[in-house]
Regions:
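Glycine-rich, anion-gripping cofactor-binding loops and their flanking helix/strand elements
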Residues: 124, 254, 270-361, 369-372, ...
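A short, small-residue-rich loop immediately preceding and capping a beta-strand
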Residues: 63-67, 87-89, 107-146, 333-341, ...
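Active-site diphosphate/adenylate-binding microenvironment
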Residues: 50-53, 68-72, 76-77, 407-491
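Glycine/aspartate-rich loop-and-adjacent alpha/beta segment that forms the canonical ThDP
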Residues: 163, 204-206, 210-249, 580-612
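N-terminal cofactor/phosphate-binding cores enriched in small/glycine residues
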Residues: 44-131
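Thiamine diphosphate
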Residues: 142, 149-163, 457-612
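Phosphate/pyrophosphate-binding active-site segments
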Residues: 31-44, 352-452, 559, 572-612
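Glycine-rich, acidic loop regions that bind phosphate or pyrophosphate groups
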Residues: 143-195, 300-408, 537
Length: 612
Protein backbone atom coordinates (compact mmCIF):
# COMPACT_ATOMS: atom_id res chain seq x y z
CA UNK A 1 0.00 0.00 0.00
CA UNK A 2 1.33 3.40 -1.01
CA UNK A 3 1.30 5.77 1.95
CA UNK A 4 1.36 9.56 1.74
CA UNK A 5 4.97 9.52 2.89
CA UNK A 6 5.87 6.95 0.21
CA UNK A 7 4.11 9.05 -2.43
CA UNK A 8 5.90 12.23 -1.43
CA UNK A 9 9.25 10.43 -1.36
CA UNK A 10 8.62 8.89 -4.80
CA UNK A 11 7.56 12.24 -6.18
CA UNK A 12 10.69 13.95 -4.86
CA UNK A 13 12.89 11.19 -6.29
CA UNK A 14 11.16 11.62 -9.66
CA UNK A 15 11.67 15.36 -9.67
CA UNK A 16 15.32 14.98 -8.64
CA UNK A 17 15.90 12.41 -11.39
CA UNK A 18 14.22 14.69 -13.92
CA UNK A 19 16.51 17.52 -12.89
CA UNK A 20 19.60 15.31 -13.27
CA UNK A 21 18.37 14.25 -16.72
CA UNK A 22 17.93 17.87 -17.80
CA UNK A 23 21.43 18.73 -16.60
CA UNK A 24 22.80 15.79 -18.59
CA UNK A 25 20.92 16.89 -21.69
CA UNK A 26 22.29 20.38 -21.24
CA UNK A 27 25.78 19.05 -21.87
CA UNK A 28 24.58 17.97 -25.31
CA UNK A 29 23.20 21.41 -26.16
CA UNK A 30 25.44 23.97 -27.80
CA UNK A 31 24.08 27.49 -27.35
CA UNK A 32 26.35 30.38 -28.29
CA UNK A 33 23.97 32.79 -26.54
CA UNK A 34 24.11 31.09 -23.14
CA UNK A 35 23.71 33.24 -20.05
CA UNK A 36 25.41 32.81 -16.68
CA UNK A 37 22.30 33.09 -14.45
CA UNK A 38 24.38 34.37 -11.55
CA UNK A 39 23.68 33.82 -7.86
CA UNK A 40 21.59 36.97 -7.51
CA UNK A 41 19.30 35.85 -10.33
CA UNK A 42 18.78 32.54 -8.53
CA UNK A 43 18.30 33.89 -5.01
CA UNK A 44 14.51 33.60 -4.87
CA UNK A 45 11.67 32.30 -6.99
CA UNK A 46 10.68 35.69 -8.41
CA UNK A 47 14.25 36.44 -9.47
CA UNK A 48 14.44 33.09 -11.22
CA UNK A 49 11.27 33.81 -13.20
CA UNK A 50 12.38 37.30 -14.09
CA UNK A 51 15.82 36.12 -15.22
CA UNK A 52 14.44 33.24 -17.28
CA UNK A 53 11.81 35.50 -18.85
CA UNK A 54 14.36 38.02 -20.06
CA UNK A 55 16.87 35.41 -21.17
CA UNK A 56 14.29 33.58 -23.27
CA UNK A 57 13.07 36.82 -24.85
CA UNK A 58 16.66 37.80 -25.66
CA UNK A 59 17.28 34.44 -27.33
CA UNK A 60 14.10 34.93 -29.34
CA UNK A 61 15.55 38.11 -30.81
CA UNK A 62 14.11 40.79 -28.54
CA UNK A 63 16.60 43.62 -28.10
CA UNK A 64 14.91 46.35 -26.06
CA UNK A 65 12.84 46.41 -22.86
CA UNK A 66 11.12 49.69 -21.98
CA UNK A 67 10.62 49.86 -18.22
CA UNK A 68 8.55 52.23 -16.10
CA UNK A 69 9.34 52.42 -12.37
CA UNK A 70 7.33 50.43 -9.84
CA UNK A 71 7.71 47.92 -7.04
CA UNK A 72 5.62 44.94 -8.14
CA UNK A 73 7.55 44.66 -11.41
CA UNK A 74 10.93 44.48 -9.63
CA UNK A 75 11.71 40.88 -10.74
CA UNK A 76 11.22 41.78 -14.41
CA UNK A 77 12.92 45.17 -14.21
CA UNK A 78 16.09 43.91 -12.53
CA UNK A 79 16.30 40.95 -14.89
CA UNK A 80 16.05 43.22 -17.93
CA UNK A 81 18.73 45.54 -16.59
CA UNK A 82 21.10 42.69 -15.67
CA UNK A 83 20.80 40.76 -18.94
CA UNK A 84 23.76 41.71 -21.17
CA UNK A 85 21.85 40.89 -24.37
CA UNK A 86 19.08 43.38 -23.62
CA UNK A 87 18.88 47.14 -23.50
CA UNK A 88 16.71 48.38 -20.63
CA UNK A 89 15.26 51.85 -21.30
CA UNK A 90 13.74 53.66 -18.31
CA UNK A 91 10.77 55.95 -19.01
CA UNK A 92 8.79 57.47 -16.15
CA UNK A 93 5.38 57.77 -17.81
CA UNK A 94 3.74 54.56 -19.04
CA UNK A 95 1.90 56.32 -21.89
CA UNK A 96 5.17 57.68 -23.24
CA UNK A 97 6.85 54.32 -22.65
CA UNK A 98 4.15 52.57 -24.66
CA UNK A 99 4.48 54.88 -27.64
CA UNK A 100 8.28 54.83 -27.45
CA UNK A 101 8.05 51.05 -27.84
CA UNK A 102 5.61 51.42 -30.73
CA UNK A 103 7.95 53.78 -32.57
CA UNK A 104 10.93 51.47 -32.13
CA UNK A 105 8.93 48.41 -33.20
CA UNK A 106 7.58 50.20 -36.28
CA UNK A 107 11.13 50.86 -37.43
CA UNK A 108 12.70 47.49 -36.59
CA UNK A 109 9.72 45.17 -37.17
CA UNK A 110 10.78 43.38 -33.98
CA UNK A 111 8.70 43.15 -30.81
CA UNK A 112 9.67 45.59 -28.09
CA UNK A 113 8.94 44.62 -24.47
CA UNK A 114 7.07 46.87 -22.04
CA UNK A 115 7.33 46.33 -18.27
CA UNK A 116 5.25 48.13 -15.66
CA UNK A 117 3.93 47.71 -12.14
CA UNK A 118 0.34 46.93 -11.15
CA UNK A 119 -2.65 49.26 -10.98
CA UNK A 120 -3.35 52.37 -13.04
CA UNK A 121 0.12 52.13 -14.60
CA UNK A 122 -1.24 49.36 -16.82
CA UNK A 123 -4.13 51.49 -18.09
CA UNK A 124 -1.73 54.13 -19.40
CA UNK A 125 -0.44 51.64 -21.97
CA UNK A 126 -3.85 51.40 -23.62
CA UNK A 127 -3.51 54.15 -26.28
CA UNK A 128 -0.20 52.67 -27.45
CA UNK A 129 -1.64 49.15 -27.40
CA UNK A 130 -4.52 50.34 -29.59
CA UNK A 131 -2.14 51.93 -32.09
CA UNK A 132 0.03 48.81 -32.17
CA UNK A 133 -3.04 46.65 -32.71
CA UNK A 134 -4.49 48.71 -35.54
CA UNK A 135 -1.16 49.24 -37.30
CA UNK A 136 0.05 45.64 -36.94
CA UNK A 137 3.04 46.57 -34.78
CA UNK A 138 4.60 43.79 -32.63
CA UNK A 139 4.62 44.54 -28.92
CA UNK A 140 4.99 42.46 -25.74
CA UNK A 141 3.25 43.98 -22.73
CA UNK A 142 4.46 42.44 -19.45
CA UNK A 143 2.44 43.76 -16.53
CA UNK A 144 3.14 42.88 -12.91
CA UNK A 145 0.19 42.11 -10.66
CA UNK A 146 -0.78 41.14 -7.13
CA UNK A 147 -1.35 37.44 -6.50
CA UNK A 148 -4.92 36.15 -6.33
CA UNK A 149 -5.23 36.49 -2.54
CA UNK A 150 -4.62 40.25 -2.77
CA UNK A 151 -7.19 40.93 -5.47
CA UNK A 152 -10.77 42.08 -4.88
CA UNK A 153 -10.03 42.90 -1.25
CA UNK A 154 -9.09 46.61 -1.36
CA UNK A 155 -5.39 45.85 -1.45
CA UNK A 156 -3.37 48.86 -2.53
CA UNK A 157 -2.53 49.55 -6.16
CA UNK A 158 -4.65 46.64 -7.34
CA UNK A 159 -7.15 46.68 -10.21
CA UNK A 160 -8.61 44.01 -12.46
CA UNK A 161 -5.86 43.57 -15.05
CA UNK A 162 -7.23 40.40 -16.65
CA UNK A 163 -7.91 41.07 -20.33
CA UNK A 164 -7.77 44.78 -19.57
CA UNK A 165 -6.92 45.60 -23.19
CA UNK A 166 -9.85 43.59 -24.53
CA UNK A 167 -9.69 42.74 -28.22
CA UNK A 168 -6.80 45.15 -28.79
CA UNK A 169 -4.26 42.41 -28.10
CA UNK A 170 -3.63 39.36 -30.24
CA UNK A 171 -3.41 37.19 -27.13
CA UNK A 172 -3.66 37.47 -23.36
CA UNK A 173 -2.27 35.08 -20.78
CA UNK A 174 -2.49 35.19 -17.00
CA UNK A 175 0.85 33.73 -15.98
CA UNK A 176 1.11 31.15 -13.22
CA UNK A 177 2.56 32.17 -9.90
CA UNK A 178 6.33 31.66 -10.03
CA UNK A 179 7.54 28.24 -9.00
CA UNK A 180 10.98 26.70 -9.30
CA UNK A 181 10.20 23.37 -10.90
CA UNK A 182 11.15 21.96 -14.27
CA UNK A 183 7.54 21.71 -15.54
CA UNK A 184 6.73 25.32 -14.57
CA UNK A 185 9.97 26.68 -16.00
CA UNK A 186 9.29 24.85 -19.25
CA UNK A 187 5.77 26.32 -19.22
CA UNK A 188 7.22 29.81 -18.78
CA UNK A 189 9.63 29.35 -21.68
CA UNK A 190 7.04 28.02 -24.10
CA UNK A 191 4.48 30.67 -23.16
CA UNK A 192 7.07 33.31 -24.05
CA UNK A 193 7.90 31.57 -27.33
CA UNK A 194 4.22 31.53 -28.23
CA UNK A 195 3.81 35.19 -27.24
CA UNK A 196 6.66 36.34 -29.49
CA UNK A 197 5.37 34.24 -32.38
CA UNK A 198 1.85 35.56 -31.88
CA UNK A 199 3.07 39.16 -31.91
CA UNK A 200 4.83 38.68 -35.24
CA UNK A 201 3.00 36.23 -37.44
CA UNK A 202 -0.37 36.19 -39.14
CA UNK A 203 -1.79 39.43 -37.86
CA UNK A 204 1.11 41.08 -36.04
CA UNK A 205 0.33 43.15 -32.97
CA UNK A 206 0.53 43.41 -29.17
CA UNK A 207 0.43 40.46 -26.76
CA UNK A 208 -0.30 40.91 -23.05
CA UNK A 209 1.20 38.70 -20.34
CA UNK A 210 0.10 39.42 -16.75
CA UNK A 211 2.66 38.31 -14.11
CA UNK A 212 1.47 37.87 -10.50
CA UNK A 213 4.26 38.11 -7.94
CA UNK A 214 4.23 37.45 -4.20
CA UNK A 215 6.71 39.07 -1.85
CA UNK A 216 9.69 39.14 -1.62
CA UNK A 217 10.00 40.97 -4.92
CA UNK A 218 13.68 41.87 -4.80
CA UNK A 219 16.48 39.30 -4.93
CA UNK A 220 18.07 38.17 -1.69
CA UNK A 221 21.66 39.39 -1.77
CA UNK A 222 22.97 37.02 0.91
CA UNK A 223 20.82 34.01 0.05
CA UNK A 224 22.05 30.75 -1.38
CA UNK A 225 20.85 29.96 -4.93
CA UNK A 226 17.63 27.96 -4.98
CA UNK A 227 18.23 26.31 -8.35
CA UNK A 228 21.23 25.09 -10.28
CA UNK A 229 22.33 27.38 -13.12
CA UNK A 230 22.53 24.44 -15.53
CA UNK A 231 18.82 23.77 -15.16
CA UNK A 232 18.01 27.37 -16.05
CA UNK A 233 20.38 27.25 -19.01
CA UNK A 234 18.52 24.28 -20.40
CA UNK A 235 15.12 25.87 -19.85
CA UNK A 236 16.30 29.01 -21.66
CA UNK A 237 17.23 27.01 -24.75
CA UNK A 238 14.95 27.78 -27.68
CA UNK A 239 14.94 26.12 -31.08
CA UNK A 240 13.76 29.12 -33.12
CA UNK A 241 14.34 32.85 -33.40
CA UNK A 242 10.90 34.11 -34.44
CA UNK A 243 12.13 37.70 -34.87
CA UNK A 244 14.13 36.55 -37.87
CA UNK A 245 11.18 35.63 -40.02
CA UNK A 246 10.91 35.74 -43.80
CA UNK A 247 8.17 37.11 -46.00
CA UNK A 248 5.13 34.93 -46.41
CA UNK A 249 4.37 33.61 -49.87
CA UNK A 250 0.65 33.08 -50.16
CA UNK A 251 -1.08 31.43 -53.09
CA UNK A 252 -3.44 33.76 -54.94
CA UNK A 253 -6.74 32.73 -56.49
CA UNK A 254 -6.15 32.15 -60.21
CA UNK A 255 -9.67 33.20 -61.21
CA UNK A 256 -9.26 36.50 -59.38
CA UNK A 257 -5.87 37.02 -61.03
CA UNK A 258 -7.36 36.47 -64.47
CA UNK A 259 -10.07 39.03 -63.74
CA UNK A 260 -7.46 41.49 -62.54
CA UNK A 261 -5.26 41.02 -65.61
CA UNK A 262 -8.17 41.42 -68.04
CA UNK A 263 -8.52 45.15 -67.34
CA UNK A 264 -6.48 47.65 -69.35
CA UNK A 265 -7.76 50.80 -67.59
CA UNK A 266 -6.97 50.03 -63.99
CA UNK A 267 -5.23 51.93 -61.19
CA UNK A 268 -3.14 50.78 -58.24
CA UNK A 269 -3.83 52.69 -55.01
CA UNK A 270 -1.22 52.32 -52.27
CA UNK A 271 -1.88 53.69 -48.79
CA UNK A 272 -0.01 53.27 -45.51
CA UNK A 273 2.31 50.26 -45.79
CA UNK A 274 5.28 49.46 -43.53
CA UNK A 275 6.74 46.48 -45.42
CA UNK A 276 8.66 43.90 -43.45
CA UNK A 277 10.45 42.82 -46.62
CA UNK A 278 12.16 46.22 -46.82
CA UNK A 279 11.34 49.53 -48.48
CA UNK A 280 13.31 49.00 -51.67
CA UNK A 281 12.00 45.48 -52.20
CA UNK A 282 8.43 46.71 -51.78
CA UNK A 283 8.99 49.61 -54.20
CA UNK A 284 10.50 47.24 -56.76
CA UNK A 285 7.55 44.85 -56.46
CA UNK A 286 4.94 47.58 -56.96
CA UNK A 287 6.90 49.01 -59.90
CA UNK A 288 7.02 45.57 -61.53
CA UNK A 289 3.32 45.07 -60.92
CA UNK A 290 2.47 48.46 -62.44
CA UNK A 291 4.67 47.75 -65.45
CA UNK A 292 3.11 44.35 -66.13
CA UNK A 293 -0.47 45.60 -65.73
CA UNK A 294 0.13 48.92 -67.48
CA UNK A 295 -1.58 50.78 -64.63
CA UNK A 296 -0.59 54.00 -62.83
CA UNK A 297 0.22 53.91 -59.09
CA UNK A 298 -1.50 56.47 -56.84
CA UNK A 299 0.74 56.58 -53.79
CA UNK A 300 0.15 58.00 -50.33
CA UNK A 301 3.19 59.42 -48.54
CA UNK A 302 3.04 56.68 -45.86
CA UNK A 303 4.75 53.97 -47.88
CA UNK A 304 8.20 53.70 -49.51
CA UNK A 305 7.16 54.56 -53.09
CA UNK A 306 7.72 58.33 -53.07
CA UNK A 307 11.21 57.78 -51.72
CA UNK A 308 12.12 55.34 -54.51
CA UNK A 309 10.57 57.17 -57.45
CA UNK A 310 13.15 56.03 -60.00
CA UNK A 311 11.87 52.48 -59.55
CA UNK A 312 8.57 53.36 -61.22
CA UNK A 313 7.59 55.48 -64.20
CA UNK A 314 3.95 55.12 -63.20
CA UNK A 315 4.03 56.97 -59.86
CA UNK A 316 1.23 59.49 -59.24
CA UNK A 317 1.47 61.59 -56.05
CA UNK A 318 -0.64 64.73 -56.57
CA UNK A 319 -4.04 63.12 -57.11
CA UNK A 320 -5.59 65.19 -54.32
CA UNK A 321 -5.03 68.32 -56.42
CA UNK A 322 -6.07 67.24 -59.91
CA UNK A 323 -9.01 65.09 -58.82
CA UNK A 324 -10.61 68.36 -57.63
CA UNK A 325 -10.80 69.49 -61.27
CA UNK A 326 -14.07 68.31 -62.91
CA UNK A 327 -12.61 68.46 -66.42
CA UNK A 328 -10.08 65.74 -65.51
CA UNK A 329 -12.40 63.17 -64.05
CA UNK A 330 -14.06 61.51 -67.04
CA UNK A 331 -10.83 60.74 -68.89
CA UNK A 332 -9.28 59.17 -65.79
CA UNK A 333 -12.17 56.87 -64.83
CA UNK A 334 -10.82 53.32 -64.29
CA UNK A 335 -12.52 50.00 -64.87
CA UNK A 336 -10.52 48.29 -62.11
CA UNK A 337 -8.95 49.39 -58.81
CA UNK A 338 -6.26 47.45 -56.97
CA UNK A 339 -5.78 48.72 -53.41
CA UNK A 340 -2.60 47.75 -51.55
CA UNK A 341 -2.69 48.26 -47.79
CA UNK A 342 -4.95 50.85 -46.19
CA UNK A 343 -6.57 53.63 -48.18
CA UNK A 344 -4.58 56.87 -48.48
CA UNK A 345 -5.47 59.74 -46.16
CA UNK A 346 -6.95 61.98 -48.87
CA UNK A 347 -10.71 62.53 -48.57
CA UNK A 348 -10.78 63.76 -52.17
CA UNK A 349 -9.32 60.47 -53.39
CA UNK A 350 -11.63 58.43 -51.18
CA UNK A 351 -14.66 60.28 -52.47
CA UNK A 352 -13.58 59.80 -56.07
CA UNK A 353 -12.87 56.09 -55.59
CA UNK A 354 -16.26 55.61 -53.98
CA UNK A 355 -17.96 57.15 -57.01
CA UNK A 356 -16.29 54.89 -59.56
CA UNK A 357 -18.10 52.07 -61.32
CA UNK A 358 -15.05 49.83 -61.24
CA UNK A 359 -14.13 46.32 -60.17
CA UNK A 360 -12.14 46.47 -56.93
CA UNK A 361 -9.40 44.23 -55.55
CA UNK A 362 -7.89 44.50 -52.05
CA UNK A 363 -4.34 43.20 -51.52
CA UNK A 364 -3.23 42.79 -47.90
CA UNK A 365 -0.97 40.48 -45.94
CA UNK A 366 -3.01 40.93 -42.76
CA UNK A 367 -6.50 39.52 -42.10
CA UNK A 368 -8.10 42.95 -41.62
CA UNK A 369 -10.80 44.89 -43.46
CA UNK A 370 -9.08 47.73 -45.33
CA UNK A 371 -12.09 49.07 -47.21
CA UNK A 372 -14.07 51.81 -45.41
CA UNK A 373 -15.85 52.50 -48.72
CA UNK A 374 -17.60 49.11 -48.49
CA UNK A 375 -17.17 48.31 -52.16
CA UNK A 376 -17.96 44.96 -53.73
CA UNK A 377 -14.30 43.96 -53.71
CA UNK A 378 -12.28 40.79 -54.28
CA UNK A 379 -9.80 40.15 -51.44
CA UNK A 380 -6.27 39.05 -52.36
CA UNK A 381 -4.22 37.83 -49.40
CA UNK A 382 -0.46 38.06 -49.89
CA UNK A 383 2.41 40.42 -50.56
CA UNK A 384 3.01 42.73 -53.50
CA UNK A 385 5.97 40.77 -54.86
CA UNK A 386 3.90 37.56 -54.99
CA UNK A 387 1.22 39.30 -57.05
CA UNK A 388 3.84 40.92 -59.29
CA UNK A 389 5.47 37.57 -60.00
CA UNK A 390 2.07 36.11 -60.85
CA UNK A 391 1.70 38.79 -63.55
CA UNK A 392 5.12 38.25 -65.13
CA UNK A 393 3.62 36.93 -68.37
CA UNK A 394 1.64 40.07 -69.17
CA UNK A 395 2.64 42.50 -71.91
CA UNK A 396 0.74 45.77 -71.98
CA UNK A 397 1.28 49.16 -73.57
CA UNK A 398 1.72 52.35 -71.57
CA UNK A 399 -0.89 54.60 -73.21
CA UNK A 400 -3.27 54.51 -70.23
CA UNK A 401 -0.50 55.19 -67.72
CA UNK A 402 0.91 57.93 -69.97
CA UNK A 403 -2.38 59.83 -69.78
CA UNK A 404 -2.13 59.85 -65.98
CA UNK A 405 1.53 60.86 -66.09
CA UNK A 406 0.72 63.85 -68.29
CA UNK A 407 -1.82 65.15 -65.77
CA UNK A 408 0.61 64.49 -62.91
CA UNK A 409 3.42 66.38 -64.66
CA UNK A 410 1.26 69.47 -65.19
CA UNK A 411 0.10 69.37 -61.57
CA UNK A 412 3.63 69.00 -60.21
CA UNK A 413 4.83 71.95 -62.28
CA UNK A 414 1.96 74.12 -61.04
CA UNK A 415 2.36 73.19 -57.36
CA UNK A 416 6.14 73.51 -57.38
CA UNK A 417 6.06 76.95 -59.00
CA UNK A 418 3.48 78.20 -56.52
CA UNK A 419 5.27 76.87 -53.46
CA UNK A 420 8.59 78.21 -54.69
CA UNK A 421 7.07 81.68 -54.97
CA UNK A 422 5.56 81.76 -51.46
CA UNK A 423 7.70 84.02 -49.26
CA UNK A 424 5.53 84.00 -46.14
CA UNK A 425 5.67 81.04 -43.78
CA UNK A 426 3.10 78.43 -44.86
CA UNK A 427 2.67 75.00 -43.28
CA UNK A 428 2.37 73.24 -46.64
CA UNK A 429 5.75 74.54 -47.80
CA UNK A 430 7.40 73.06 -44.71
CA UNK A 431 6.56 69.51 -45.87
CA UNK A 432 7.58 70.35 -49.45
CA UNK A 433 10.99 71.65 -48.36
CA UNK A 434 11.60 68.66 -46.09
CA UNK A 435 11.08 66.32 -49.04
CA UNK A 436 13.72 68.22 -51.03
CA UNK A 437 16.37 69.01 -48.43
CA UNK A 438 16.53 66.21 -45.86
CA UNK A 439 19.66 64.05 -46.06
CA UNK A 440 19.18 60.81 -47.98
CA UNK A 441 17.66 58.05 -45.89
CA UNK A 442 16.40 60.29 -43.08
CA UNK A 443 13.53 58.57 -41.21
CA UNK A 444 10.51 60.86 -40.84
CA UNK A 445 7.59 60.63 -38.43
CA UNK A 446 4.44 62.60 -39.27
CA UNK A 447 1.99 63.71 -36.60
CA UNK A 448 -1.69 63.15 -37.25
CA UNK A 449 -4.06 65.98 -38.22
CA UNK A 450 -2.57 68.48 -40.70
CA UNK A 451 1.07 67.32 -40.69
CA UNK A 452 0.31 64.02 -42.41
CA UNK A 453 -2.14 65.73 -44.79
CA UNK A 454 0.26 68.44 -45.91
CA UNK A 455 2.85 65.73 -46.52
CA UNK A 456 0.37 63.81 -48.66
CA UNK A 457 -0.40 66.96 -50.67
CA UNK A 458 3.13 68.23 -51.19
CA UNK A 459 5.79 65.61 -50.39
CA UNK A 460 7.78 65.40 -53.62
CA UNK A 461 8.66 62.08 -55.21
CA UNK A 462 12.38 61.44 -55.56
CA UNK A 463 15.17 59.11 -54.56
CA UNK A 464 15.90 60.27 -51.03
CA UNK A 465 14.62 56.94 -49.65
CA UNK A 466 13.31 58.52 -46.45
CA UNK A 467 11.27 55.96 -44.47
CA UNK A 468 8.07 57.74 -43.44
CA UNK A 469 5.88 56.62 -40.54
CA UNK A 470 2.80 57.90 -38.76
CA UNK A 471 0.37 56.59 -36.16
CA UNK A 472 -2.39 55.95 -38.70
CA UNK A 473 -3.67 52.84 -36.97
CA UNK A 474 -5.88 54.75 -34.56
CA UNK A 475 -5.08 58.13 -36.20
CA UNK A 476 -4.75 59.93 -32.89
CA UNK A 477 -2.33 62.63 -31.80
CA UNK A 478 -1.60 60.59 -28.66
CA UNK A 479 2.05 59.79 -28.17
CA UNK A 480 3.36 61.79 -31.14
CA UNK A 481 6.66 62.77 -29.55
CA UNK A 482 7.07 59.47 -27.71
CA UNK A 483 6.64 57.47 -30.92
CA UNK A 484 9.14 59.65 -32.76
CA UNK A 485 11.68 59.20 -29.95
CA UNK A 486 11.27 55.43 -30.18
CA UNK A 487 11.64 55.53 -33.95
CA UNK A 488 14.89 57.52 -33.57
CA UNK A 489 16.33 55.33 -30.81
CA UNK A 490 19.53 53.62 -31.98
CA UNK A 491 18.67 54.56 -35.56
CA UNK A 492 19.63 57.24 -38.04
CA UNK A 493 19.04 60.92 -37.25
CA UNK A 494 15.25 61.25 -37.45
CA UNK A 495 12.80 64.09 -38.10
CA UNK A 496 9.36 64.63 -36.56
CA UNK A 497 6.94 66.96 -38.36
CA UNK A 498 4.23 68.07 -35.94
CA UNK A 499 1.82 70.84 -35.12
CA UNK A 500 1.76 72.65 -31.81
CA UNK A 501 -1.22 70.81 -30.30
CA UNK A 502 0.07 67.33 -31.14
CA UNK A 503 3.41 68.31 -29.61
CA UNK A 504 1.84 69.74 -26.46
CA UNK A 505 -0.49 66.76 -26.09
CA UNK A 506 2.61 64.59 -25.61
CA UNK A 507 5.02 67.14 -24.16
CA UNK A 508 5.52 64.88 -21.13
CA UNK A 509 7.61 62.73 -23.46
CA UNK A 510 10.31 65.39 -23.20
CA UNK A 511 11.21 63.61 -19.95
CA UNK A 512 12.31 60.63 -22.04
CA UNK A 513 14.78 62.57 -24.18
CA UNK A 514 17.65 61.67 -21.83
CA UNK A 515 17.12 57.98 -22.67
CA UNK A 516 17.43 58.58 -26.41
CA UNK A 517 20.45 56.97 -28.05
CA UNK A 518 20.36 58.86 -31.32
CA UNK A 519 19.08 62.11 -32.77
CA UNK A 520 15.60 63.58 -33.20
CA UNK A 521 14.88 66.91 -34.88
CA UNK A 522 11.36 68.16 -34.17
CA UNK A 523 9.98 70.46 -36.86
CA UNK A 524 7.27 72.22 -34.89
CA UNK A 525 4.73 74.16 -36.94
CA UNK A 526 3.14 76.52 -34.44
CA UNK A 527 -0.11 78.01 -35.74
CA UNK A 528 -1.46 78.46 -32.21
CA UNK A 529 -4.22 75.91 -32.37
CA UNK A 530 -5.76 72.99 -34.22
CA UNK A 531 -5.39 73.88 -37.88
CA UNK A 532 -7.34 70.86 -39.08
CA UNK A 533 -10.54 72.27 -37.59
CA UNK A 534 -10.23 75.34 -39.83
CA UNK A 535 -11.27 73.07 -42.69
CA UNK A 536 -14.58 72.10 -41.04
CA UNK A 537 -17.87 73.98 -41.14
CA UNK A 538 -17.70 74.58 -37.39
CA UNK A 539 -14.82 77.01 -38.03
CA UNK A 540 -17.37 79.78 -38.67
CA UNK A 541 -18.71 79.72 -35.10
CA UNK A 542 -16.44 82.44 -33.72
CA UNK A 543 -15.49 82.26 -30.04
CA UNK A 544 -17.11 78.85 -29.56
CA UNK A 545 -14.86 77.49 -32.31
CA UNK A 546 -11.72 79.05 -30.86
CA UNK A 547 -12.39 77.83 -27.33
CA UNK A 548 -13.59 74.28 -27.95
CA UNK A 549 -12.07 73.28 -31.30
CA UNK A 550 -9.02 75.37 -32.22
CA UNK A 551 -8.00 75.55 -28.52
CA UNK A 552 -5.00 77.91 -28.82
CA UNK A 553 -2.50 77.36 -25.99
CA UNK A 554 -0.08 80.28 -26.46
CA UNK A 555 2.89 78.35 -25.05
CA UNK A 556 6.40 79.78 -25.27
CA UNK A 557 8.19 76.81 -26.78
CA UNK A 558 11.66 78.21 -26.23
CA UNK A 559 10.97 78.31 -22.49
CA UNK A 560 9.43 74.83 -22.54
CA UNK A 561 12.48 73.41 -24.30
CA UNK A 562 14.81 75.17 -21.88
CA UNK A 563 13.01 73.56 -18.93
CA UNK A 564 13.78 70.10 -20.35
CA UNK A 565 17.29 70.94 -21.55
CA UNK A 566 16.32 70.58 -25.21
CA UNK A 567 17.98 72.63 -27.96
CA UNK A 568 15.63 75.17 -29.56
CA UNK A 569 15.76 77.12 -32.84
CA UNK A 570 13.29 79.61 -34.28
CA UNK A 571 13.18 79.55 -38.09
CA UNK A 572 11.87 83.01 -38.99
CA UNK A 573 12.54 82.66 -42.73
CA UNK A 574 12.73 79.89 -45.31
CA UNK A 575 16.50 80.34 -45.45
CA UNK A 576 16.66 79.76 -41.69
CA UNK A 577 14.59 76.61 -42.05
CA UNK A 578 16.55 75.10 -44.95
CA UNK A 579 19.84 75.78 -43.18
CA UNK A 580 18.53 74.02 -40.06
CA UNK A 581 17.41 70.84 -41.87
CA UNK A 582 20.28 70.52 -44.34
CA UNK A 583 22.47 69.10 -41.58
CA UNK A 584 20.95 67.04 -38.77
CA UNK A 585 22.71 66.62 -35.40
CA UNK A 586 24.25 63.25 -34.62
CA UNK A 587 22.80 63.07 -31.11
CA UNK A 588 20.21 64.67 -28.88
CA UNK A 589 16.87 66.38 -29.44
CA UNK A 590 16.43 69.68 -31.24
CA UNK A 591 13.21 71.65 -31.80
CA UNK A 592 12.87 73.94 -34.84
CA UNK A 593 9.82 76.17 -34.46
CA UNK A 594 8.13 77.57 -37.57
CA UNK A 595 5.34 80.02 -36.74
CA UNK A 596 2.42 80.30 -39.15
CA UNK A 597 -1.13 81.62 -39.13
CA UNK A 598 -3.68 78.80 -39.33
CA UNK A 599 -6.38 80.85 -41.04
CA UNK A 600 -3.87 82.11 -43.61
CA UNK A 601 -2.61 78.52 -44.03
CA UNK A 602 -6.12 77.38 -44.93
CA UNK A 603 -6.55 80.09 -47.57
CA UNK A 604 -3.09 79.45 -49.02
CA UNK A 605 -3.75 75.71 -49.25
CA UNK A 606 -7.01 76.29 -51.09
CA UNK A 607 -5.27 78.61 -53.54
CA UNK A 608 -2.50 76.14 -54.31
CA UNK A 609 -4.81 73.16 -54.79
CA UNK A 610 -7.43 75.10 -56.76
CA UNK A 611 -4.90 76.46 -59.25
CA UNK A 612 -4.16 73.07 -60.83
Amino acid sequence: MLTSANFIESHLIYRYAATILFVFLLLLVTDSNSSSFDVLARSNVNSVWGALTMEVLARLGVETVVVSPGSRSTPLTLAAERNPKLEAVSILDERTAGFFAVGLAKRTHKPVVLVCTSGSAVVNYHPAVLEASMSGTPLLVLTADRPAELRDCSSGQTIDQLKIFGDSVRAFHEMALPEVSVPLLAYLRQTLVHAVNRSLHGNAGPVHLNFPFRDPLAPSIDAEPIIDAHVLELQATVSTRPCECIGTRVGLDTVALERLASHHRGIIVVGAVNPREGDEAFADAVAMLADKLGWPVLSDVLNPLRGHASDSTALICHYDAFLRQPDQLDSLAPTAILQIGALPTSKVLRGWLGSQDAVSFLLTDRPVNTDPLHRVATPLFGQAHVLAEAMHHLKTDSAWTDSWRAVEAMTVASIDSQLEAIDGLFEGKVAWLLSRHLPVGTPVFLASSMSVRYAEYFWSAGNRACPIQANRGANGIDGTLGTALGMAHRGQPTVLLTGDLAFLHDSNALLATRELKGSLTVVLVNNNGGGIFEHLSVSGMGEVFERHFATPQSVQFDTLCQAYGVEYLHAATWDDFVTAIDGLPAAGVRVIEVRTDRKADKMQLNRVLAAD
